[in-house]
Amino acid sequence: DKSNHHKYDWYVFNSHWTFEKFRMMFGLPAEKCLVIKNGIDKIQKAKPYKQGDPIRIIHQNTPWRGLSVLLGAMQLVKNPLITLDVYSSCEVYGKQFFDQNDHEYTELYEQARKLPNVNYIGYKPNSFIKSNMHKYNMYAYPSIFEETSCISLLECMAGGLYSITTNLGALFETGAEFPMYIPFDNDLRRLSMKFASAIEASANILHEETIHKHLETQSNYVNAYYNWNKIGTSWTRFLTGAI
């Protein structure tokens, strides 16, 4: 309701994609809008992949955002070097949310447990994920959810993981030019097939020097622009002027 705009001094968004959506949908006054992006901690980088080594993929997103698509893709992946670790659960939002919602995804978790190239691990705190990220080579997120940003993508990019995701929502802004983007498809079976092909293709080039340089540049980019010193400074400058 545009008549309520005078009640607010500022609207702060975590991506330009989100700002544009709200501006167009609700007629927000642009002079009251600001984008300050999410920040991440320093993360230990993965070592460059050597050809012939096991290829470990991480997926640490909530189950309704694309896990079914990823499990469908893993059924089609034939490279014996590839395994996927799934840290997906409703527990990330607390016990009450877990108790009310996690049962809806029991069959999906069971499917993950039965696949030979998938390890279903379930919930682990973010501190565990970040401290173990250097053990992985790739991050796969076939998002069917319009993200306003994506901290898990940023963390994996900072950690030097080759990332594959869709171009839905603000993911293309968050990832910039670094991930492999799979065009979103409402046909989720077809999206699974595309993701399987992307995983196989990515696995075949992980050892190449150009990919190693790409991931080094990627990590430096994220650490330069999404570190908490930079983001914190943006908040401090904004709040100093706003207050």
Name every feature range the model reports, one short phrase each.
Residues 1, 7-33, 40:
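A short, active-site helix/loop in glycosyltransferases that binds the activated sugar's phosphate group
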Residues 12, 49-66, 71-75, 85:
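Conserved donor-binding/catalytic core segment of Leloir-type glycosyltransferases
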Residues 17-18, 35-45, 90-93:
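Short beta-strand->alpha-helix junction loop in the catalytic core
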Residues 98-124:
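Nucleotide-activated donor-binding/catalytic signature segment of Leloir-type glycosyltransferases, i.e.
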Residues 134-148, 161:
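Acidic donor-binding loop of glycosyltransferase active sites
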Residues 162-165, 172:
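Short hydrophobic beta-strand element within catalytic cores of glycosyltransferases
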Residues 186, 207-240:
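A charged, aromatic-enriched C-terminal amphipathic alpha-helix characteristic of glycosyltransferases
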